[in-house]
From Swiss-Prot:
Keyword hit for Metal-binding: yes
Free-text cofactor note: Binds 1 zinc ion per subunit.
Active-site residues annotated for this sequence: R192
Superkingdom assignment: Bacteria
Disruption phenotype: Cells lacking this gene are unable to grow in minimal medium with mannose as the sole carbon source. They show impaired growth in rich medium, and impairment increases in the presence of greater than 1.4 mM mannose.
The protein's name in its UniProt record: Mannose-6-phosphate isomerase ManA
Keyword annotations: Isomerase, Metal-binding, Zinc
This enzyme's EC code(s): 5.3.1.8
SUPFAM superfamilies xrefs: RmlC-like cupins
Enzyme class: isomerase
Length: 315
């Protein structure tokens, strides 16, 4: 049992639509087209690494495989979540993700992908694509084949602080000028439906996955309803943004100090603004914007001090 938070070093991904905004978190980014920060990642395409304590140098996958007590002895062959920060300097492709059953059959045992977005920042008039207007699979197929994207896709204006739940089967895309934190199932399976006819670094059109997309898109497209809950704990305002079968995600606004107890199998904390410190036992752990902490099972009582905004997630 450990009574210390585990700080993780993220993995960065260059993307055709990425930019430089992730540098504002204090990160050293690999290029001017850095699109993704994989903050908590235990996937074959990216592994975040512990930066402190007795588990320093371990990947998240290694902790899950060999130190399951840190996660309350949860079952499963892989860590269940993946947390990212996305910098959309340009529009992301219009895409959809499969559910677990479809992905297991068609993607060699991969998980499906239900996700959610918290809008950290965005340009004025920024928008996302969130759902579609087709009423039947036949209409959906026809509109895709004809390239009737303006008629098919639903566009939604966004502002900082907005939150969107994106279940598998939902047509979606993050638009230009948006910085978002994404919590998702631990999957990297994406079916690209439309990519604005963009070309990659070699001058080739990026691959589309029309057949699979049409098979997994939910018709009709009905936005998921979710209820937001608030709780004040001393100087900490906690907001529950979503609770679903795959994860629970919330926001913490710290404006002073608060005493808490870690009672989940694990708790993931991403600091998106401000700074402070966590006190656990006799030890003090400073944190700042851009830090990502995993609070393991059994950590017990701890105290937060400072002024910060965090996105937190757990099962």
């Amino acid at each position: 049992m450990t009574t210390e938070p585990l700080f993780f070093k993220p993995v960065f991904k260059e993307r055709i639509w990425g930019g430089t905004a992730l540098a504002d978190f204090g990160y050293t980014i690999p290029s001017q087209r850095t699109g993704e920060c994989w903050a908590f990642a235990a996937h074959q395409n990216g592994q975040s690494v512990v930066q402190n304590g007795m588990y320093k140098g371990f990947t998240l996958s290694e902790l899950w495989e060999h130190h399951r007590h840190l996660f309350g002895q949860l079952e499963g062959d892989r860590f269940p979540l993946l947390t990212k920060i996305l910098d959309a300097d340009q529009d992301l492709s219009v895409q959809v993700h499969p559910n677990d059953e479809y992905a297991n059959i068609h993607e060699n045992g991969e998980l499906g992908k239900t996700e959610c977005w918290y809008i950290i920042d965005c340009q004025k008039d920024a928008e996302i694509i969130y759902g579609h207007n087709a009423t039947t699979k036949e209409e959906l197929t026809t509109m895709i084949e004809r390239g009737e994207w303006d008629e098919l896709l639903r566009r939604v204006k966004v502002k900082p602080g907005d939150f969107f739940y994106v279940p598998s089967g939902t047509v979606h895309a993050i638009g230009k000028g948006i910085l978002a934190l994404e919590t998702q199932q631990n999957s990297d399976t994406t079916y690209r439906l439309y990519d604005y006819d963009r070309k990659d670094a070699e001058g080739k059109l990026r691959e589309l996955h029309l057949k699979k997309s049409i098979e997994v898109i939910e018709v009709p497209s009905i936005p998921e309803r979710h209820t937001v809950h608030h709780e004040q704990i001393e100087d900490l305002l906690t907001t529950t943004l979503i609770e679903c079968a795959y994860f629970s995600v919330g926001k913490w606004n710290l404006s002073g100090s608060a005493s808490l107890k870690q009672q989940k199998p694990f708790l993931l904390i991403s600091v998106i603004e401000g700074e402070g410190r966590m006190i656990s036992g006799e030890y003090v752990y400073p944190f700042k914007k851009g830090d990502h902490m995993l609070l393991p099972y059994g950590l017990g009582e701890f105290k937060l001090e400072g002024y910060a905004e965090c996105i937190v997630s757990h099962l």
